[in-house]
Each structure stands twice: as structure tokens, then as C-alpha cells.
Amino acid sequence: MPAVKVKENEPFDVALRRFKRSCEKAGVLAEVRSREFYEKPTAERKRKAAAAVKRHAKKVQREQRRSVRLY
């Protein structure tokens, strides 16, 4: 859990912004969202495999776009 020490004479909204940023960097909200409902191990593997296929296709497409230039 991220912790933020409030500096002297620091406005509350600035400290809150720093806390939100540290939570986002630590991935707290993403973790909470992923654990909100139970996901069967097979469903999790299937989702991760689909994400890997999508990432690979995106990478291949990016590489093809780069190599098309013939000038």
C-alpha cells in the first residue's frame, strides 16, 4: 500500500494527487479490479493467451508498417 507523508505547509489536494499517482504506479486499482470477481484458472489462462496473441499481432503489424517504405 503506497504511503505519502504530507509535507509541512503542503495543501491537501497536492498530497492527495501524489497519493493517487503513487497508487497508480503501484497498480493498486488494477489489482482490485482483477480480484473483484473470482476467475477460473482456465478462464485466466485463456484471457492471458488471447492478450499475448493480440500483442504479437500488434507487434508484427508495427514491424510491417516500418519495413514497407521503399525509398
Curated annotation (Swiss-Prot):
Residues 49-71 are annotated as: Disordered. Residues 60-71 have a biased composition (Basic and acidic residues). Keywords: Ribonucleoprotein, Ribosomal protein. The gene is rpsU. GO terms for molecular function: structural constituent of ribosome. Belongs to the bacterial ribosomal protein bS21 family. GO terms for biological process: translation. This is Small ribosomal subunit protein bS21. GO terms for cellular component: ribonucleoprotein complex; ribosome. Gene3D superfamilies: Ribosomal protein S8. Coiled coil: none annotated. Residues 49-59 have a biased composition (Basic residues).
